[in-house]
């Protein structure tokens, strides 16, 4: 994702930059005026935006948190159909620290630290990221392990 797209983060606790704006209250008039090409937030927030006709150009990032289930296939399909851009999942800790992130090959979630778990796929990923990952079908196991 280089260069950084104009991104609206619809959750508190993130750092803003010139191209990344944080909207802790979710989608607001201010967020709409920002005209993001990418949005990031919890699946519940993203679902509320699916009927607004937003024209995104880059990606949707769905946050899941420790103790929560992974992004459902139904939500993934809904976001793809509604926004017309790729959908990526990021699994975050309580302080919004990145624990695992979906790669561009959509081959699963690459973990940011090694848990030594035998369930991690340590084979080369099509995206080129050498970090071990949970394959797409096993992401709920990752959520349980990170909890």
Question: What are the roles of these predicted feature ranges?
Answer:
Residues 1-147:
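Active-site glycine/GP-rich loop and adjacent strand/helix microenvironment
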